[in-house]
From Swiss-Prot:
Its EC number is 2.3.2.-, 2.3.2.27. PROSITE patterns: WD_REPEATS_1, WD_REPEATS_2, WD_REPEATS_REGION, ZF_RING_1, ZF_RING_2, ZF_TRAF. It catalyses: S-ubiquitinyl-[E2 ubiquitin-conjugating enzyme]-L-cysteine + [acceptor protein]-L-lysine = [E2 ubiquitin-conjugating enzyme]-L-cysteine + N(6)-ubiquitinyl-[acceptor protein]-L-lysine. Pathway: Protein modification; protein ubiquitination. The lineage of its organism: Eukaryota, Metazoa, Chordata, Craniata, Vertebrata. WD repeats lie at residues 394-433, 437-474, 477-513, 515-554, 557-594, 597-638, 641-669. This is E3 ubiquitin-protein ligase TRAF7. Phosphorylated by MAP3K3. Changing K346E: In CAFDADD; no significant effect on phosphorylation of MAPK1 and/or MAPK3. One of its GO terms (molecular function) is ubiquitin-protein transferase activity. The modification Phosphoserine is found at S61, S88, S91. It is an enzyme of class 2 (transferase). E3 ubiquitin and SUMO-protein ligase that plays a role in different biological processes such as innate immunity, inflammation or apoptosis. Potentiates MAP3K3-mediated activation of JUN/AP1 and DDIT3 transcriptional regulators. Negatively regulates MYB transcriptional activity by sequestering it to the cytosol via SUMOylation. Plays a role in the phosphorylation of MAPK1 and/or MAPK3, probably via its interaction with MAP3K3. Residues 15-31, 49-67 have a biased composition (Polar residues).
């Protein structure tokens, strides 16, 4: 082995030489000056002028044992063994040939496991450049809301500042501190080694490694071209790891150099000397121009084939999009045909309904004319026109229920604001008191004797003493909101989801007597008349015997769910979700008429009866009230004064009270 090669390899065997011998023939110029703290600074300038490195060479006075091991840096390289002659497959000549790689193209050792990047400072950094959370030099310093600077990772992991105990929130990068840290001098990673077996590992200066110190900000530039960087032989993976500066010497002695025509079938493997001899006799060497032309043609064919594949893929994608668009057009066309058929069917149904309505109107006109000719209707009485006489204002939400205490001329109103207001309807016409106690919307009110019962969305019934307007009892009545209440024969009935509960009234207590079942929806309407209870649930009205609590009859509706019920001396009336009012004969239970006119759900019904006539009042989602004469089943008046849906009705002494979503209660009289 030559003396030059021995000098190169002495560093592995513990020889005296620690620095690489500069090659004068390359034209490299070296200058040494003194940097900070009298550290020697060596500037190496290559002759071609392509790159210049300013590096601080380690001196005993500038070496430091301070080590910083970030946990998220690149992997460190394994220790380098002594290079030796080994199997290789590339020669120095092939490095300079067109078919091989350049000497500058090297392969780094594979990263087997993640380890912290070695960081050993040439001089002790100032404590002002250390994070108070991790006690190490700042890495990616940021300013937080408290004004202090920490590593970004530390600031994100810690909840509070260790100085003033303020919650940490990153505000902005601390560029000034980052630049100061970038000016610190460190030892090249290839000049450091692990000291001890702790975790995270601590690094120290390796006297056999790279002797240069560099600025932290220029670390990657230096380490990417460091002569002490471990590499592998590019020809054979079985060759041991080498230093970059020893790669060229290794390639001259490699025993695994392959023929440049190995891809065509040549099986030669040898060293540099046999490689040159083989080229003179290789059968592929004389055909290299033809082989190269063939390779070029194959390459052109591959490129053309790839272009054709791309064109085919593009055409397929366009075909797929075109098919999708055709499918969409077909679906759209089918949908339009369906809509057209549906509209045509609806128009036909509407036309038939209009014809039925016209026929019904003709029948009613004929009936009215006949009654006029017989003198039954009598003369028109302007005093029967209902007018709005006043408005009670005070609730902070929609009014859902009304109830009148005729003994004291008091009106009770329940609202979404969870309160019940007591109104004087005789003298002051003002709110006497606001009753509070429910935790939900007040949905139902009922009076029995001198007690007021209120049902709410909070599933409870509260008993109030009307004399002093105080709460006297609270009963957990249902598992769902209490929708409606009615009393009769000292018994209270409460309606909820699929259930009606029967309560015996004992003073201020309610004793559960029975639960009426067989209901399939919300019980939104309850009316007690004479000895019968009428309940509305979904599209049925059930009639119960109050004494036996048995269901004795069921009426079926066809206009949506039942929302309201009223009973007169001769008729049973119900309002439905589908804007209709159905009328049955109370004796025969036969439906006699369906009243139309509303354009919204009929929420409430009320009855005013006199010896001469009976009037039914209906309240609807369409913000209107309608007055119906039960003598001829026609609407005699429409009342429009509310600004929202009318939800509740109550009557007393010929007066009508209406509550609405506009949070008001209006008073109507003739």
């Amino acid at each position: 082995m030559s003396s030059g090669k021995s000098a190169r390899y002495n560093r592995f065997s513990g020889g005296p030489s620690n620095l690489p011998t500069p090659d004068v023939t390359t034209g490299t110029r070296m200058e040494t000056t003194f940097g900070p703290a009298f550290s020697a600074v060596t500037t190496i300038t290559k002759a071609d002028g392509t790159s210049t490195y300013k590096q601080h060479c380690r001196t005993p006075s500038s070496s430091s044992t301070l080590a910083y091991s970030p946990r998220d840096e690149e992997d460190s390289m394994p220790p380098i063994s002594t290079p030796r002659r080994s199997d290789s497959a590339i020669s120095v000549r092939s490095l300079h040939s067109e078919s091989s790689m350049s000497l500058r193209s090297t392969f780094s050792l594979p990263e087997e496991e993640e380890e912290p990047e070695p960081l050993v400072f040439a001089e002790q950094p100032s404590v002002k450049l250390c994070c108070q959370l991790c006690c190490s030099v700042f890495k990616d310093p940021v300013i937080t809301t408290c004004g202090h600077t920490f590593c970004r990772r530390c600031a994100l992991k810690s909840e509070k500042c260790p100085v003033d105990n303020v919650k940490l929130t990153v505000v902005v990068n601390n560029i000034a501190v980052a630049e100061q840290i970038g000016e610190l001098f460190i030892h090249c990673r290839h000049g450091c080694r692990v000291a001890g077996s702790g975790k995270p590992p601590i690094f120290e200066v390796d006297p056999r490694g790279c002797p240069f110190t560099i600025k932290l900000s220029a670390r990657k530039d230096h380490e990417g071209s460091c002569d002490y960087r471990p590499v592998r032989c590019p020809n054979n993976p079985s060759c041991p790891p080498l230093l970059r500066m020893n790669l060229e010497a290794h390639l001259k002695e490699c025993e695994h150099i392959k023929c440049p025509h190995s891809k065509y079938g040549c099986t030669f493997i040898g060293n540099q000397d046999t490689y040159e001899t083989h080229l003179e006799t290789c059968r592929f060497e004389g055909l290299k121009e033809f082989l190269q032309q063939t390779d070029d043609r194959f390459h052109e064919m591959h490129v053309a084939l790839a272009q054709k594949d791309q064109e085919i893929a593009f055409l397929r994608s366009m075909l797929g999009k075109l098919s999708e668009k055709i499918d969409q057009l077909e679906k759209s066309l089918e949908l339009k045909f369906d809509v057209l058929d549906e509209n045509q069917s609806k128009l036909s149904e509407d036309l038939m309904e209009f014809r039925r309505d016209a026929s019904m109107l003709n029948d009613e006109l004929s009936h009215i004319n006949a009654r006029l000719n017989m003198g039954i209707l009598g003369s028109y009485d302007p005093q029967q026109i209902f007018k709005c006489k006043g408005t009670f204002v005070g609730h902070q939400g929609p009014v859902w229920c009304l109830c009148v205490y005729s003994m004291g001329d008091l009106l009770f109103s329940g609202s979404s604001d969870k309160t019940i207001k007591v109104w004087d309807t005789c003298t002051t016409y003002k709110c006497q008191k606001t009753l509070e106690g429910h935790d939900g919307i007040v949905l139902a009110l009922c009076i029995q004797g001198c007690k007021l019962y209120s049902g709410s969305a909070d599933c409870t019934i509260i008993v109030w003493d009307i004399q002093n307007l105080q709460k006297v009892n609270t009963i957990r009545a249902h598992d769902n909101p209490v929708c409606t209440l009615v009393s009769s024969h000292n018994v209270l009935f409460s309606g909820s989801l699929k259930a009606i509960k029967v309560w015996d009234i004992v003073g201020t207590e309610l004793k559960l007597k029975k639960e009426l079942t067989g209901l399939n929806h919300w019980v939104r309407a309850l009316v007690a008349a004479q000895s019968y209870l009428y309940s509305g649930s979904y599209q049925t009205i059930k009639i119960w015997d109050i004494r036996t609590l048995d269901c004795i009859h069921v009426l079926q509706t066809s206009g949506g769910s039942v929302y309201s019920i009223a009973v007169t001396n001769h008729h049973i009336v119900c309002g439905t979700y589908e804007n209709l009012i159905h009328v049955w004969d109370i004796e025969s239970k036969e439906q006699v008429r369906t009243l139309t006119g509303h354009v919204g759900t009929v929420y409430a019904l009320a009855v005013i009866s006199t010896p001469d006539q009976t009037k039914v009042f209906s309240a609807s989602y369409d913000r209107s009230l309608r007055v119906w004469s039960m003598d001829n089943m026609i609407c005699t008046q429409t009342l429009l004064r509310h600004q929202g849906s009318v939800t509740a009705l109550a009557v007393s002494r010929g007066r009508l009270f209406s509550g609405a979503v506009d949070s008001t209660v209006k008073v109507w009289t003739c």
